Protein backbone atom coordinates (compact mmCIF):
# COMPACT_ATOMS: atom_id res chain seq x y z
CA UNK A 1 0.00 0.00 0.00
CA UNK A 2 1.53 3.30 -1.09
CA UNK A 3 1.99 5.93 1.59
CA UNK A 4 -0.75 8.54 1.41
CA UNK A 5 0.45 11.58 -0.45
CA UNK A 6 0.12 15.02 1.14
CA UNK A 7 -2.65 16.64 -0.90
CA UNK A 8 -1.82 20.23 -1.65
CA UNK A 9 -5.26 21.35 -2.73
CA UNK A 10 -5.68 23.91 0.04
CA UNK A 11 -3.30 26.83 0.61
CA UNK A 12 -0.91 26.22 3.50
CA UNK A 13 -0.44 28.69 6.37
CA UNK A 14 1.77 28.52 9.47
CA UNK A 15 0.33 29.83 12.74
CA UNK A 16 1.11 29.61 16.43
CA UNK A 17 -0.34 30.50 19.81
CA UNK A 18 1.40 33.24 21.81
CA UNK A 19 0.63 34.93 25.14
CA UNK A 20 1.27 34.93 28.88
CA UNK A 21 1.92 31.74 30.85
CA UNK A 22 -1.28 29.98 32.04
CA UNK A 23 -3.59 32.13 29.93
CA UNK A 24 -4.57 28.99 28.00
CA UNK A 25 -2.42 28.76 24.85
CA UNK A 26 -2.05 24.98 24.98
CA UNK A 27 -5.70 24.44 25.97
CA UNK A 28 -6.74 26.56 22.98
CA UNK A 29 -4.44 24.57 20.67
CA UNK A 30 -6.10 21.37 21.93
CA UNK A 31 -9.57 22.93 21.60
CA UNK A 32 -9.00 24.01 17.99
CA UNK A 33 -7.90 20.51 17.04
CA UNK A 34 -10.79 18.91 18.99
CA UNK A 35 -13.49 21.17 17.56
CA UNK A 36 -12.22 20.76 13.98
CA UNK A 37 -11.90 16.99 14.56
CA UNK A 38 -15.68 16.83 15.09
CA UNK A 39 -15.95 18.09 11.50
CA UNK A 40 -13.33 15.63 10.23
CA UNK A 41 -10.80 18.41 9.60
CA UNK A 42 -8.21 17.46 12.23
CA UNK A 43 -6.88 14.58 14.25
CA UNK A 44 -7.78 14.93 17.89
CA UNK A 45 -4.70 15.98 19.87
CA UNK A 46 -5.01 15.78 23.61
CA UNK A 47 -3.85 18.58 25.93
CA UNK A 48 -1.16 16.33 27.46
CA UNK A 49 -0.02 15.33 24.03
CA UNK A 50 0.59 18.98 23.12
CA UNK A 51 1.89 20.02 26.54
CA UNK A 52 4.63 17.35 26.61
CA UNK A 53 6.37 19.02 23.73
CA UNK A 54 9.43 17.24 22.37
CA UNK A 55 12.69 19.16 22.59
CA UNK A 56 14.28 19.98 19.29
CA UNK A 57 17.74 21.25 18.47
CA UNK A 58 17.80 24.20 16.12
CA UNK A 59 21.32 25.56 15.51
CA UNK A 60 22.40 24.08 18.82
CA UNK A 61 19.58 25.71 20.76
CA UNK A 62 17.22 23.45 22.68
CA UNK A 63 13.61 24.41 22.00
CA UNK A 64 10.52 22.54 23.14
CA UNK A 65 7.79 22.90 20.53
CA UNK A 66 4.57 21.07 19.73
CA UNK A 67 3.38 20.90 16.15
CA UNK A 68 -0.21 20.11 15.31
CA UNK A 69 -1.95 20.30 11.96
CA UNK A 70 -5.55 20.86 11.02
CA UNK A 71 -7.69 22.19 8.22
CA UNK A 72 -10.53 24.65 7.91
CA UNK A 73 -12.88 24.69 4.91
CA UNK A 74 -10.41 26.97 3.14
CA UNK A 75 -6.91 26.15 4.32
CA UNK A 76 -4.40 23.70 5.71
CA UNK A 77 -2.63 24.90 8.88
CA UNK A 78 0.54 23.94 10.69
CA UNK A 79 0.26 25.21 14.26
CA UNK A 80 3.05 25.56 16.84
CA UNK A 81 2.66 25.78 20.59
CA UNK A 82 5.48 26.10 23.12
CA UNK A 83 5.26 25.03 26.76
CA UNK A 84 7.54 27.69 28.23
CA UNK A 85 8.15 31.40 27.75
CA UNK A 86 11.85 30.84 26.97
CA UNK A 87 10.86 28.44 24.19
CA UNK A 88 8.76 31.16 22.55
CA UNK A 89 11.61 33.63 22.69
CA UNK A 90 14.03 31.14 21.13
CA UNK A 91 11.51 29.98 18.55
CA UNK A 92 10.69 33.45 17.33
CA UNK A 93 14.27 34.70 17.23
CA UNK A 94 15.74 31.63 15.50
CA UNK A 95 12.77 31.28 13.17
CA UNK A 96 12.79 27.57 13.99
CA UNK A 97 9.04 27.48 13.58
CA UNK A 98 7.92 29.96 10.93
CA UNK A 99 4.74 31.85 11.71
CA UNK A 100 2.74 33.67 9.05
CA UNK A 101 0.42 34.88 11.78
CA UNK A 102 -0.21 34.37 15.48
CA UNK A 103 -3.17 33.70 17.75
CA UNK A 104 -2.65 35.81 20.88
CA UNK A 105 -4.33 34.23 23.90
CA UNK A 106 -5.27 36.62 26.72
CA UNK A 107 -7.13 35.53 29.84
CA UNK A 108 -10.28 37.65 30.12
CA UNK A 109 -10.05 37.21 33.89
CA UNK A 110 -6.54 38.71 34.13
CA UNK A 111 -6.09 40.95 31.11
CA UNK A 112 -2.73 41.59 29.41
CA UNK A 113 0.33 40.53 31.46
CA UNK A 114 4.12 41.04 31.01
CA UNK A 115 4.59 38.14 28.58
CA UNK A 116 1.57 39.29 26.58
CA UNK A 117 3.49 42.49 25.94
CA UNK A 118 6.76 40.69 25.30
CA UNK A 119 5.24 38.31 22.75
CA UNK A 120 3.58 41.21 20.91
CA UNK A 121 6.92 43.05 20.80
CA UNK A 122 8.73 39.91 19.61
CA UNK A 123 6.13 39.40 16.89
CA UNK A 124 6.73 42.95 15.73
CA UNK A 125 10.54 42.50 15.84
CA UNK A 126 10.71 39.21 13.98
CA UNK A 127 8.14 40.10 11.34
CA UNK A 128 4.96 38.27 12.36
CA UNK A 129 2.63 40.96 11.03
CA UNK A 130 -0.77 39.44 11.68
CA UNK A 131 -2.25 38.75 15.11
CA UNK A 132 -5.76 37.50 15.90
CA UNK A 133 -6.80 37.62 19.58
CA UNK A 134 -8.65 35.02 21.63
CA UNK A 135 -9.96 36.32 24.97
CA UNK A 136 -9.97 33.09 26.94
CA UNK A 137 -11.73 32.08 30.18
CA UNK A 138 -14.82 34.12 29.30
CA UNK A 139 -16.82 31.70 31.49
CA UNK A 140 -15.00 33.14 34.53
CA UNK A 141 -16.04 36.74 33.79
CA UNK A 142 -19.65 37.59 34.66
CA UNK A 143 -19.35 41.28 34.00
CA UNK A 144 -19.72 42.30 30.33
CA UNK A 145 -18.10 45.67 31.09
CA UNK A 146 -15.00 43.96 32.43
CA UNK A 147 -14.72 41.96 29.21
CA UNK A 148 -14.99 45.18 27.19
CA UNK A 149 -12.30 46.76 29.33
CA UNK A 150 -9.89 43.87 28.71
CA UNK A 151 -10.61 44.05 24.98
CA UNK A 152 -9.80 47.78 25.00
CA UNK A 153 -6.56 47.14 26.88
CA UNK A 154 -5.50 44.51 24.35
CA UNK A 155 -6.29 46.82 21.42
CA UNK A 156 -4.26 49.64 23.01
CA UNK A 157 -1.34 47.31 23.65
CA UNK A 158 -1.34 46.12 20.03
CA UNK A 159 -1.46 49.71 18.75
CA UNK A 160 1.45 50.61 21.02
CA UNK A 161 3.60 48.14 19.06
CA UNK A 162 2.42 49.30 15.62
CA UNK A 163 -0.20 46.60 15.09
CA UNK A 164 -3.62 47.81 13.87
CA UNK A 165 -5.24 47.48 17.31
CA UNK A 166 -8.60 48.90 16.25
CA UNK A 167 -8.97 46.49 13.32
CA UNK A 168 -7.58 43.34 14.96
CA UNK A 169 -10.19 40.57 15.24
CA UNK A 170 -10.87 39.71 18.90
CA UNK A 171 -13.00 36.67 19.78
CA UNK A 172 -14.02 35.85 23.36
CA UNK A 173 -14.64 32.29 24.50
CA UNK A 174 -13.47 29.46 26.70
CA UNK A 175 -10.93 26.98 25.36
CA UNK A 176 -11.58 24.58 28.23
CA UNK A 177 -15.36 24.59 27.78
CA UNK A 178 -14.99 24.14 24.01
CA UNK A 179 -12.59 21.24 24.58
CA UNK A 180 -15.01 19.57 27.01
CA UNK A 181 -17.88 19.94 24.53
CA UNK A 182 -15.87 18.56 21.63
CA UNK A 183 -14.68 15.59 23.68
CA UNK A 184 -18.33 14.81 24.37
CA UNK A 185 -18.71 14.76 20.61
CA UNK A 186 -20.60 17.97 19.97
CA UNK A 187 -20.00 21.59 19.08
CA UNK A 188 -22.05 23.78 21.40
CA UNK A 189 -21.95 27.52 22.11
CA UNK A 190 -18.29 27.38 23.21
CA UNK A 191 -17.20 25.30 20.24
CA UNK A 192 -18.91 27.80 17.94
CA UNK A 193 -16.66 30.52 19.37
CA UNK A 194 -13.57 28.49 18.45
CA UNK A 195 -14.98 28.04 14.93
CA UNK A 196 -15.57 31.81 14.81
CA UNK A 197 -11.93 32.33 15.83
CA UNK A 198 -10.74 30.07 12.99
CA UNK A 199 -13.02 31.90 10.57
CA UNK A 200 -11.27 35.15 11.55
CA UNK A 201 -7.83 33.51 11.23
CA UNK A 202 -8.87 32.35 7.74
CA UNK A 203 -9.92 35.86 6.75
CA UNK A 204 -7.39 38.03 8.57
CA UNK A 205 -4.06 36.21 8.15
CA UNK A 206 -3.20 36.36 4.44
CA UNK A 207 -1.92 33.33 2.55
CA UNK A 208 1.87 33.78 2.39
CA UNK A 209 3.69 34.16 -0.90
CA UNK A 210 5.27 30.88 -1.94
CA UNK A 211 9.08 30.97 -1.94
CA UNK A 212 9.13 30.56 -5.71
CA UNK A 213 7.06 33.74 -6.15
CA UNK A 214 9.56 35.93 -4.30
CA UNK A 215 12.51 37.74 -5.87
CA UNK A 216 15.53 35.55 -6.66
CA UNK A 217 18.27 35.14 -4.05
CA UNK A 218 20.99 32.50 -3.71
CA UNK A 219 23.79 32.54 -1.12
CA UNK A 220 27.14 31.62 -2.69
CA UNK A 221 28.62 28.47 -1.17
CA UNK A 222 31.42 27.69 -3.60
CA UNK A 223 33.08 29.02 -6.76
CA UNK A 224 34.77 27.03 -9.54
CA UNK A 225 36.22 27.91 -12.87
CA UNK A 226 35.52 25.54 -15.72
CA UNK A 227 37.94 25.69 -18.63
CA UNK A 228 36.34 27.14 -21.73
CA UNK A 229 33.06 27.85 -19.95
CA UNK A 230 33.82 30.40 -17.26
CA UNK A 231 32.94 30.74 -13.60
CA UNK A 232 30.35 28.60 -11.83
CA UNK A 233 28.93 29.50 -8.42
CA UNK A 234 27.07 26.87 -6.44
CA UNK A 235 24.51 27.15 -3.68
CA UNK A 236 20.94 26.47 -2.69
CA UNK A 237 18.37 28.87 -4.10
CA UNK A 238 16.81 30.56 -1.05
CA UNK A 239 13.88 32.11 -2.87
CA UNK A 240 12.58 32.91 -6.33
CA UNK A 241 13.53 31.45 -9.69
CA UNK A 242 16.64 31.92 -11.85
CA UNK A 243 16.70 31.34 -15.61
CA UNK A 244 19.32 31.34 -18.33
CA UNK A 245 19.62 34.89 -19.67
CA UNK A 246 18.64 36.57 -16.39
CA UNK A 247 20.60 39.58 -15.22
CA UNK A 248 21.80 39.11 -11.64
CA UNK A 249 23.80 41.06 -9.10
CA UNK A 250 26.57 39.71 -6.89
CA UNK A 251 26.16 41.42 -3.51
CA UNK A 252 28.20 41.53 -0.31
CA UNK A 253 31.81 41.73 0.96
CA UNK A 254 32.93 43.92 -1.97
CA UNK A 255 31.32 46.32 -4.43
CA UNK A 256 28.16 45.03 -6.09
CA UNK A 257 28.75 43.56 -9.57
CA UNK A 258 26.25 42.90 -12.34
CA UNK A 259 26.42 39.88 -14.65
CA UNK A 260 24.27 37.53 -16.73
CA UNK A 261 23.37 33.89 -16.11
CA UNK A 262 24.59 31.78 -19.05
CA UNK A 263 23.76 28.37 -17.60
CA UNK A 264 21.95 26.62 -14.74
CA UNK A 265 23.00 23.09 -13.78
CA UNK A 266 21.77 20.55 -11.27
CA UNK A 267 23.49 17.18 -10.79
CA UNK A 268 25.57 17.95 -13.92
CA UNK A 269 22.45 18.35 -16.02
CA UNK A 270 21.58 21.54 -17.86
CA UNK A 271 18.34 23.15 -16.70
CA UNK A 272 16.23 26.00 -18.03
CA UNK A 273 15.80 27.31 -14.53
CA UNK A 274 16.54 26.74 -10.85
CA UNK A 275 13.97 27.51 -8.17
CA UNK A 276 13.69 27.91 -4.39
CA UNK A 277 15.07 24.84 -2.64
CA UNK A 278 17.21 23.62 -5.57
CA UNK A 279 20.95 23.07 -5.16
CA UNK A 280 22.35 24.48 -8.38
CA UNK A 281 25.48 25.57 -10.18
CA UNK A 282 25.09 28.88 -11.99
CA UNK A 283 27.38 29.86 -14.84
CA UNK A 284 28.12 33.59 -14.95
CA UNK A 285 29.16 35.55 -18.05
CA UNK A 286 32.49 37.36 -17.87
CA UNK A 287 32.91 36.93 -14.12
CA UNK A 288 36.35 35.88 -12.85
CA UNK A 289 36.67 33.25 -10.14
CA UNK A 290 38.55 35.64 -7.85
CA UNK A 291 35.72 38.20 -8.02
CA UNK A 292 33.26 35.94 -6.23
CA UNK A 293 33.55 34.30 -2.81
CA UNK A 294 31.52 32.42 -0.26
CA UNK A 295 29.34 34.82 1.73
CA UNK A 296 28.20 36.85 -1.25
CA UNK A 297 24.73 36.36 -2.70
CA UNK A 298 23.39 36.25 -6.23
CA UNK A 299 20.12 38.13 -6.54
CA UNK A 300 17.70 39.93 -8.77
CA UNK A 301 19.24 43.38 -9.45
CA UNK A 302 18.22 45.99 -6.87
CA UNK A 303 16.41 43.52 -4.61
CA UNK A 304 18.90 43.43 -1.72
CA UNK A 305 21.77 45.72 -0.75
CA UNK A 306 24.97 45.33 1.30
CA UNK A 307 25.02 46.77 4.82
CA UNK A 308 27.39 47.02 7.76
CA UNK A 309 25.25 48.43 10.52
CA UNK A 310 21.93 47.10 11.80
CA UNK A 311 19.76 46.53 14.85
CA UNK A 312 18.90 42.99 15.83
CA UNK A 313 17.10 40.94 18.43
CA UNK A 314 19.25 38.10 19.76
CA UNK A 315 19.01 35.09 22.04
CA UNK A 316 22.25 34.16 23.82
CA UNK A 317 22.76 30.44 24.36
CA UNK A 318 22.84 29.24 27.94
CA UNK A 319 25.80 27.33 29.34
CA UNK A 320 23.78 24.09 29.13
CA UNK A 321 23.20 24.67 25.43
CA UNK A 322 26.95 24.89 24.89
CA UNK A 323 27.02 28.67 24.95
CA UNK A 324 29.23 31.03 26.92
CA UNK A 325 29.76 30.51 30.64
CA UNK A 326 30.23 34.22 31.30
CA UNK A 327 28.38 37.40 30.34
CA UNK A 328 29.52 39.72 27.56
CA UNK A 329 29.72 43.50 27.67
CA UNK A 330 29.43 46.51 25.40
CA UNK A 331 31.93 46.35 22.53
CA UNK A 332 31.96 42.53 22.41
CA UNK A 333 33.38 41.42 19.01
CA UNK A 334 32.23 37.97 17.90
CA UNK A 335 31.64 36.67 14.36
CA UNK A 336 28.24 37.00 12.75
CA UNK A 337 27.42 34.01 10.59
CA UNK A 338 25.05 35.23 7.88
CA UNK A 339 23.83 32.59 5.39
CA UNK A 340 27.19 31.05 4.43
CA UNK A 341 29.97 33.04 6.06
CA UNK A 342 31.36 34.58 9.24
CA UNK A 343 31.94 38.34 9.42
CA UNK A 344 33.40 39.99 12.52
CA UNK A 345 31.30 42.72 14.10
CA UNK A 346 31.09 44.73 17.29
CA UNK A 347 28.02 44.81 19.53
CA UNK A 348 26.58 47.91 21.15
CA UNK A 349 24.12 47.24 23.97
CA UNK A 350 21.04 49.41 24.66
CA UNK A 351 21.62 52.22 27.16
CA UNK A 352 21.11 50.98 30.68
CA UNK A 353 22.12 47.41 29.82
CA UNK A 354 25.47 46.72 31.46
CA UNK A 355 25.97 43.15 30.32
CA UNK A 356 24.24 40.19 28.72
CA UNK A 357 24.07 36.84 30.50
CA UNK A 358 23.94 33.41 28.82
CA UNK A 359 20.22 32.56 28.34
CA UNK A 360 19.17 36.22 27.89
CA UNK A 361 17.46 37.83 24.94
CA UNK A 362 18.32 41.44 24.12
CA UNK A 363 18.15 44.07 21.40
CA UNK A 364 21.58 45.04 20.02
CA UNK A 365 23.20 47.30 17.44
CA UNK A 366 25.88 45.66 15.30
CA UNK A 367 28.62 47.11 13.11
CA UNK A 368 30.29 44.61 10.77
CA UNK A 369 33.82 45.00 9.37
CA UNK A 370 32.60 44.14 5.84
CA UNK A 371 29.23 44.74 4.18
CA UNK A 372 26.87 41.78 3.78
CA UNK A 373 23.57 41.45 1.89
CA UNK A 374 21.03 42.12 4.64
CA UNK A 375 17.35 43.00 5.00
CA UNK A 376 14.80 43.08 7.80
CA UNK A 377 14.19 39.50 8.85
CA UNK A 378 17.62 38.12 7.86
CA UNK A 379 18.65 35.49 10.44
CA UNK A 380 22.19 35.14 11.76
CA UNK A 381 24.18 33.14 14.27
CA UNK A 382 26.73 34.65 16.65
CA UNK A 383 29.89 32.59 16.85
CA UNK A 384 33.21 32.53 18.64
CA UNK A 385 35.85 30.49 16.88
CA UNK A 386 33.29 28.40 15.01
CA UNK A 387 31.16 27.71 18.09
CA UNK A 388 27.63 29.13 18.13
CA UNK A 389 26.98 31.33 21.17
CA UNK A 390 23.84 33.12 20.02
CA UNK A 391 21.16 33.45 17.41
CA UNK A 392 19.45 36.53 16.06
CA UNK A 393 17.38 38.32 13.48
CA UNK A 394 17.87 41.70 11.78
CA UNK A 395 15.08 44.04 12.91
CA UNK A 396 16.25 47.30 11.30
CA UNK A 397 18.93 48.30 8.79
CA UNK A 398 20.86 51.39 9.86
CA UNK A 399 23.43 51.81 7.07
Curated annotation (Swiss-Prot):
It catalyses: GTP + H2O = GDP + phosphate + H(+). Residues 136-139 are annotated as: G4. GO terms for molecular function: GTP binding; GTPase activity; translation elongation factor activity. GTP binds at residues 19-26, 81-85, 136-139. One of its GO terms (cellular component) is cytosol. It is an enzyme of class 3 (hydrolase). Pfam families: GTP_EFTU, GTP_EFTU_D2, GTP_EFTU_D3. Keywords: Cytoplasm, Elongation factor, GTP-binding, Hydrolase, Magnesium, Metal-binding, Nucleotide-binding, Protein biosynthesis. It is found in: Cytoplasm. Residues 10-209 form the tr-type G domain. Residues 81-84 are annotated as: G3. Belongs to the TRAFAC class translation factor GTPase superfamily. Classic translation factor GTPase family. EF-Tu/EF-1A subfamily. PANTHER family: ELONGATION FACTOR TU, MITOCHONDRIAL (PTHR43721:SF22), ELONGATION FACTOR TU-RELATED (PTHR43721). This is Elongation factor Tu.
